Amino acid sequence: MKEKIKKFIPLFVVTALIFVILLGVVIVKVVQRYTPGKERVDINEYYNVNGSDAALIYNDVMTEDLVKVIDNNIYIDIDDVTSNFNQRFYWDSYEGLLIYTTDKDVIKAYAGTKEYTVSGQKNNTEYDIVKIDGQNVYVALDYIKKYTKIDYEYYENPGRLYLYSVDGTYQTVKAKKKSVIRRKGGIKSLIVADVKKGEELKIIEEIDGWTKVKTEDGYI
C-alpha cells in the first residue's frame, strides 16, 4: 500500500506541474492578446514622403499624391489641381504657360517666373508661380488660392498638406487621458502618434466601433 502511495505522489506532482505550465501558457496568451501593441509605424513610410516631398491629404482622406516644398513654398501637380478642385486652370505645354479664365479676365503665368498678367495687366508675386520637374508641372499653392476656394494646413516632419475644398462643421472630442492613435482599428495596430491628456481631436469618421481622428499636430 505504501509503495502505491509513493508511486501516486510523483504522478500527482507531475500532473500538477503540467497543469500549472499549461495554465501559465494560457494566461500569457490571454495577456498578450489583450495587451495593446507598442510598435510604431515608420512615419515617413506611412505618409509615403521623402526629400522635399510632402503628403497630400485631401478633405481628411490620405492620397498617394505628393506635393513639392521649394524655398518654403508649396507646389501642387497641375493634374491634381484640375482633377480635384479647379478645372479652370489649363497648362499649355507648348508655350510653357499656365492659363486661368474667368467671366471677365484671362490670367496667364509663364513657368519659372514670378510674374502673371490679368487681361494684359502685369502683376508680381514673391515666388515662382509654376515649376517644372521633368514631365511634371507644379503650381504654387498660394497662386492657386487666389482663384480657388480652398483652405489648407501644413505640418512638418514629415511634410503633410491638408487641403480642404468643402465647407462644413465637424465634431471634436478631448482626450480623457494620455493615449495614442493607431494606423487601423485594433489595439495591436501600429502606433502613428501620441495623444496628450486634454488634447482636442477632430473626429473624421466612425469605423466598426473605432473613431478615426486627427490630432492637433496633424496626424490621422
Predicted regions and their residues:
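Primary recognition of N-terminal secretory signal peptides and signal-anchoring hydrophobic helices
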Residues: K2-I207
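Sparse recognition of residues in long alpha-helices and their boundaries
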Residues: R160, V213-K214
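A short macromolecule-binding patch
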Residues: V173-K176, T215-I220
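Short aromatic-glycine-enriched beta-strand elements
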Residues: D208-K212
